Amino acid sequence: MSFMDQIPGGGNYPKLPVECLPNFPIQPSLTFRGRNDSHKLKNFISEIMLNMSMISWPNDASRIVYCRRHLLNPAAQWANDFVQEQGILEITFDTFIQGLYQHFYKPPDINKIFNAITQLSEAKLGIERLNQRFRKIWDRMPPDFMTEKAAIMTYTRLLTKETYNIVRMHKPETLKDAMEEAYQTTALTERFFPGFELDADGDTIIGATTHLQEEYDSDYDSEDNLTQNGYVHTVRTRRSYNKPMSNHRNRRNNNPSREECIKNRLCFYCKKEGHRLNECRARKAVLTDLELESKDQQTPFIKTLPIVHYIAIPEMDNTAEKTIKIQNTKVKTLFDSGSPTSFIRRDIVELLKYEIYETPPLRFRGFVATKSAVTSEAVTIDLKINDLHITLAAYILDNMDYQLLIGNPILRRYPKILHTVLNTRESPDSLKPKTYRSETVNNVRTYSAGNRGNPRNIKLSFAPTILEATDPKSAGNRGDSRTKTLSLATTTPAAIDPLTTLDNPGSTQSTFAQFPIPEEASILEEDGKYSNVVSTIQSVEPNATDHSNKDTFCTLPVWLQQKYREIIRNDLPPRPADINNIPVKHDIEIKPGARLPRLQPYHVTEKNEQEINKIVQKLLDNKFIVPSKSPCSSPVVLVPKKDGTFRLCVDYRTLNKATISDPFPLPRIDNLLSRIGNAQIFTTLDLHSGYHQIPMEPKDRYKTAFVTPSGKYEYTVMPFGLVNAPSTFARYMADTFRDLRFVNVYLDDILIFSESPEEHWKHLDTVLERLKNENLIVKKKKCKFASEETEFLGYSIGIQKIAPLQHKCAAIRDFPTPKTVKQAQRFLGMINYYRRFIPNCSKIAQPIQLFICDKSQWTEKQDKAIDKLKDALCNSPVLVPFNNKANYRLTTDASKDGIGAVLEEVDNKNKLVGVVGYFSKSLESAQKNYPAGELELLGIIKALHHFRYMLHGKHFTLRTDHISLLSLQNKNEPARRVQRWLDDLATYDFTLEYLAGPKNVVADAISRAVYTITPETSRPIDTESWKSYYKSDPLCSAVLIHMKELTQHNVTPEDMSAFRSYQKKLELSETFRKNYSLEDEMIYYQDRLVVPIKQQNAVMRLYHDHTLFGGHFGVTVTLAKISPIYYWPKLQHSIIQYIRTCVQCQLIKSHRPRLHGLLQPLPIAEGRWLDISMDFVTGLPPTSNNLNMILVVVDRFSKRAHFIATRKTLDATQLIDLLFRYIFSYHGFPRTITSDRDVRMTADKYQELTKRLGIKSTMSSANHPQTDGQSERTIQTLNRLLRAYASTNIQNWHVYLPQIEFVYNSTPTRTLGKSPFEIDLGYLPNTPAIKSDDEVNARSFTAVELAKHLKALTIQTKEQLEHAQIEMETNNNQRRKPLLLNIGDHVLVHRDAYFKKGAYMKVQQIYVGPFRVVKKINDNAYELDLNSHKKKHRVINVQFLKKFVYRPDAYPKNKPISSTERIKRAHEVTALIGIDTTHKTYLCHMQDVDPTLSVEYSEAEFCQIPERTRRSILANFRQLYETQDNPEREEDVVSQNEICQYDNTSP
């Protein structure tokens, strides 16, 4: 079939001779401009094909020319270009049309189409214009997007209530039929009841003469009328305006069209001259012309329909409570005339065993739900209220205060309920429905009203409010004649069914487009339940989806709902006939010699027997069981459920003992959780009675026979209670989903997880498709679709979150204290399920374990363990799921009490992202005797075994605070168990990282005295003494003077302005004045004590600095402590200033962010080997000739590097020798050398030589290796290459150094895009792997050519370096800010910048100082007045500096001057900041003395300091200030163990 044959209009038509071509001129209306409108393009092609098919064309070229004449720009321009490229004689007409279609076709925008539909309504457009526009828009819909029934439902939502109700009663089967019925209904209404229309709310009928305005419709075009926001531009008309349909099948062909009527001034109704429509006599004689014409036959539109009239219920919300009986069960009922439908609680439905049927989703909010919620289940209820029998349908809710709520539709249908329950004043007779019957005699229709069978003639002067029709199908099914009514004048068409829409079907604010439209949507289902309309009770914002309700199926895409509605349901259908086709069947193998059960039924009560019979009958109906003649029999028992119903269980214990076990391991829950990774959206599925969906092996069915008091039955499906049933089911589910990595299956619980909604729909489709193929049914109400958080196997799983369920934690928290071993075991069993959330769980639970093992009595220790476990679980951190692409760090620890570990996820900067899991284990008695090294290794091995499913085969970091691993690996003959551990350890890929530990003997941090400057320890405040300060305080004195308690004041001149301001406020403002009061001679502001100015610092010192009341917290906490008790003006401002100038806070609190100083890179190198940088790589294992260090020298221009093997004993003289031999002799003398402050570079010999050679030596600031970033980056690459090359021969790493240097210099750099060799030499040296061509031939250049080539490379390289430097500055300086200091300023220095890390750093101050700035090096580096004993340089980068904020009034004491005063105040020494070994003096800081000042103590005076304080400050001084012994930086070390971990890593 050709492309043209697939387009409407492309079929075969009778051919005419080509001479007829002049008779087919170009049609201006048949044009295509090239808009991306698929509907218009298809119409254009169809019309063109239709016209051309009627002519005999000589060739394809003439057909192309004819089609081209109907194209306008830009389509015409495309056609010209296409024909010129292809050649008009070379292409076929089919190719031309196909090209046009592919170029301009655009798939329709479904959202835009639906938005356009929502703007249509019969009330605005009239029925004909509605039909025309709806059809035009609907034709743009993809053919398979929606079923015919869904299209009908969508269309009927646009009709007025009158038309809507009548159309759905006729059950149209196609959209065309629905539109036809709507047109006929509207036409009939106009002819029956001229001059009447509904008012705005549709509740009453008012008389009005309709004047039809002569208005025209604009031709509807998708691009012109579908705007970006989806609104449709239309011409406004009266809601009763209906343009005649000239081509309607019930209209005569000779009838003039509407345009002709307008042109010739004809009546729209009778088509005659001389009058208008509202004056037409023929139209007024409506009762004499009731039959509508039809082409085929004359059919009356409405047969005899009884018309029922109800007395209007007052428009008020009447409510009443009443207890009614349903099936002898008392039900608490609310009669509410304000509710638009009826509801019933789920527990009553289950108790009364009502049959539940599905409905489209109903969204509601109000009395029955505080938030928007959705339900899609309903039941039919038969009620009897006094002598009134009622049948109603009610939606099912999970939670509601009342068990049943009967709403307005039922109360309007049965007014007698109002008289009985709500006590209305109408008499019972007046509340009886009045029935009107219509009869047609001699083509004249008359109406009669019937009351108790006595008809009387009446004159009908208004439109009927209710139409009532008998449903014969319902009557046949239920044995009675159920009446279905249709309301035309009420807001809710409740007479058809209470489960209907509340909003106006014709309203433009309809919300149907916000909900998925089900495939099975229909106007009226066969059982009489109208359930196709998506119902709302209150309007909901678009896309406002509430996921709190259990029914989330409606949130899925439409195509998923349509595809899988049959398998996602709340009821379990009968056993399908092809269930035996399932590849898995359950069999029962009996042990040899075992006897099958032959047991009698248990005794049951009559009530229980009835329950058993009901359940058995339901199983029989579903074909799950059949009557049996088996020789076996097992008894049954009834197990009560939480909702009061029962579950039938078969006692298969005897059968299970005789069955051969078939164990199949269930998946580990922690393994399942580890697969979630970075999932963002989740769905949980629960199979509906999963066991009952697997058939029994026919030969083994008789073994499942069970006996009840009324008979014997056997299962055709797998029953619950069989010993091997879980294995069969688990094996079946594992085989079904084994290859899907996005699915976790645990028996009948299924979790689907994805990283995006689009991916999730595909995953969900895959899983549901397999379930559908296996005939497995999913229980809808237990599923949760497409949510960001869900519950699975007792865990709450969300985005980057795994947490225990709160109600499970609450159950553990409320668990009573165990008194017996059994209770203790039960408690630990609950704890063990969540032990992954509890750090050191085994250690905490050890006292309970001792009690269970009868090694201890229950004491206070066990009580504390219980409380600790409960607190740890309830306050447990939220774990993050394992992500195979992330970086992980495992930290282990071991002690005599047990071993523990924590697995953490870290980012690329080694910062913590979250905890993945905890592990802990108690030690056995023998393990407690292991040496410390083996015990630490045991902890590592156990932790690796526990997290093996995550870490094996993945690189990670292993942290431990013990060097056991290295020492044990170096043993010649380790113990056998250690050897096994080391072999096991070798199967993992990890980097070993040792936690920093103490290397010097220091005092215990806990026993150390405070060594920083702190204000005097505050004493409790004596508020009585404040009275003496009132006179000098401006506020207090003003208040006392106003209260006549004070006549004179002592306010200082500085405070006089504030004093006068307070006086003025007290005189003029009542609000200000009433806040102050005097009690016991103390001034209060409201209920807070007013603090004088001179006592404000004392209050802040107490609540900020005091060891009991303070704690040096921040502004918020300190304000919260002070403000409820004390008051003074600008209280918050005072607290902010006080804390900002607190010395202790400045020293101990981390400064965030520490991004001071803008990035200032080194100047760009001018040429090759003019500017070089160098550094050392240390920590290498010694080689056979004792080489254990590498000198790295890098040309900052070409990035070429030399790696020179040497020894750590290298001194300055030997360093100079290496530079001459390997650098200067090959490349000449550089202008600058950049390095760190290594002792070899700071040596006098090195400095003297570089000075004589004219080399400028630039060094980094203290502890800031980023200054020499070039060397640091090169060393990182060198370390990686060493691990790759020397992994199998670590003792001879120096052998591989030349190869590593060649590989490094041959590799292009990211900055320059070329290799260092190419930049330096002008060519890439030849290698065996490549042929020598291109730039390699540069070696054969002439001298002039080579010079030109190198010069070009130099210019290009400088430009690239400058560009890279600008980009680096731009990227790094975005989050930085400059810190500008002046000479003489005091600053605090971060401990990481200058001082050595030691033990107990958590209790050490973060900043030290203050120190004075003595010289500015540049904007990023300053020289400080550091102590003269310090050998390190005094230049510090601003990254580690913080301005010291000075508070003069915080230091009330002066420093001691005389020796006697120093000795007397020796106990006030708080810190040692320097030692002058020449003069044997000690520089100290003292309490309450300005910290910028130091006190010099002689050696004899220093010995007078209390011993405890002296030892403490000396220990702190050694730890923070002394020079490090090892000049090498630890981060450059490549340890033996690190190299071993990279045996499989390529460079």
Curated annotation (Swiss-Prot):
Residues 1159-1324 form the Integrase catalytic domain. Mg(2+) 2 binds at residues 893, 936, 961. GO terms for molecular function: aspartic-type endopeptidase activity; ATP binding; DNA binding; DNA-directed DNA polymerase activity; RNA binding; RNA-directed DNA polymerase activity; RNA-DNA hybrid ribonuclease activity; zinc ion binding. It is found in: Cytoplasm; Nucleus. Keywords: Acetylation, Aspartyl protease, ATP-binding, Cytoplasm, DNA integration, DNA recombination, DNA-binding, DNA-directed DNA polymerase, Endonuclease, Hydrolase, Magnesium, Metal-binding, Multifunctional enzyme, Nuclease, Nucleotide-binding, Nucleotidyltransferase, Nucleus, Protease, RNA-binding, RNA-directed DNA polymerase, Transferase, Transposable element, Viral release from host cell, Virion maturation, Zinc, Zinc-finger. Residues 620-797 form the Reverse transcriptase domain. Its EC number is 3.4.23.-, 2.7.7.49, 2.7.7.7, 3.1.26.4. PROSITE patterns: INTEGRASE, RT_POL, ZF_CCHC. One of its GO terms (cellular component) is nucleus. The keyword RNA-binding applies. The record marks 207-208, 233-234, 309-310, 442-443, 535-536, 1011-1012, 1037-1038 as: Cleavage. The keyword Magnesium applies. Retrotransposons are mobile genetic entities that are able to replicate via an RNA intermediate and a reverse transcription step. In contrast to retroviruses, retrotransposons are non-infectious, lack an envelope and remain intracellular. Ty3 retrotransposons belong to the gypsy-like elements (metaviridae). PANTHER family: PROTEIN CBG26694 (PTHR37984), PROTEIN NYNRIN-LIKE (PTHR37984:SF5). This is Transposon Ty3-G Gag-Pol polyprotein. The lineage of its organism: Eukaryota, Fungi, Dikarya, Ascomycota, Saccharomycotina.
